[in-house]
């Protein structure tokens, strides 16, 4: 059981104090496009990405309190104001706090691969989730997935072309091991230093489906 560390940061939100769905225009004080990172870890990816896109508002969620604390500290240290951090379980948070059709982008980097065959049904990104998250992406919204686990990357790459309402932005490739302009987290860099390959997948929503 994780130890809950109090987080005193202007960038940390209590999901129970948000509406259903949340009024993100009020939260950020503007109506800029909204993007979501699921599993922000220590916040290095979202911090760099937010700096690159100052006119986009980012929500960074993580189930682990320690990661949320480190992410908030990083944002404060670098003066990044277009990110808000929430400790939450992904699916529940999305259903309760995100309006359908409102997300300009979703980023999922190196989620738990659940490597044992009997546990693979626990993986976050599967066909059911991809159908689910499409409802929350805006038309032309981007879906990014990255993993260092070969089986996970190959599995997602294999089923994504059959998912209605998405276009492959890396075609004719179904995945790539490098993605120009996409920031690497500390964990990605560690995996690559160990000789592992990162699988990058990028799709965009279409009017179909």
Curated annotation (Swiss-Prot):
S-adenosyl-L-methionine binds at residues 37, 62, 89, 112. GO terms for cellular component: tRNA methyltransferase complex. One of its GO terms (biological process) is tRNA methylation. The keyword Plastid does not apply. Gene3D superfamilies: Vaccinia Virus protein VP39. It holds the Pfam family Methyltransf_4. Pathway: tRNA modification; N(7)-methylguanine-tRNA biosynthesis. The active site is at 112. InterPro entries: SAM-dependent_MTases_sf, tRNA_(Gua-N-7)_MeTrfase_Trmb, tRNA_methyltr_TrmB_bact. Its EC number is 2.1.1.33. GO terms for molecular function: tRNA (guanine(46)-N7)-methyltransferase activity. It comes from the Bacteria. Substrate binds at residues 116, 148. Keywords: Methyltransferase, S-adenosyl-L-methionine, Transferase, tRNA processing. PANTHER family: 3-DEOXY-D-MANNO-OCTULOSONIC-ACID TRANSFERASE/TRNA GUANINE-N 7 - -METHYLTRANSFERASE, PENTACOTRIPEPTIDE-REPEAT REGION OF PRORP DOMAIN-CONTAINING PROTEIN. Belongs to the class I-like SAM-binding methyltransferase superfamily. TrmB family. NCBIfam families: tRNA (guanosine(46)-N7)-methyltransferase TrmB. This is tRNA (guanine-N(7)-)-methyltransferase. The gene is trmB.
């Amino acid at each position: 059981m994780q130890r809950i560390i109090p987080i005193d940061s202007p960038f940390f939100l209590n999901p129970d104090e948000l509406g259903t769905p949340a009024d993100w225009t009020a939260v950020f004080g503007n109506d800029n496009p909204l993007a979501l990172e699921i599993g922000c870890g220590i916040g290095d990816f979202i911090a760099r990405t937010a700096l690159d896109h100052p006119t986009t508002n980012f929500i960074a969620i993580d189930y682990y309190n320690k990661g949320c604390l480190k992410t908030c500290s990083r944002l404060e240290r670098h003066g990044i104001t277009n990110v808000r951090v929430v400790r939450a379980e992904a699916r529940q948070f999305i259903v309760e706090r995100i309006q359908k059709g409102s997300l300009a982008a979703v980023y999922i980097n190196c989620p738990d691969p659940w490597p044992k065959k009997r546990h693979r049904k626990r993986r976050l990104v599967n066909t059911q989730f991809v159908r689910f998250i499409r409802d929350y992406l805006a038309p032309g919204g981007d879906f990014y997935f990255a993993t260092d686990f070969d089986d996970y990357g190959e599995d997602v790459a294999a089923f994504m072309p059959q998912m209605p309402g998405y276009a492959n932005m890396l075609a004719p490739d179904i995945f790539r091991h490098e993605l120009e302009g996409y920031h690497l987290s500390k964990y990605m860099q560690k995996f690559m230093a160990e000789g592992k390959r990162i699988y990058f997948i990028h799709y965009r929503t279409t009017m179909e489906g």
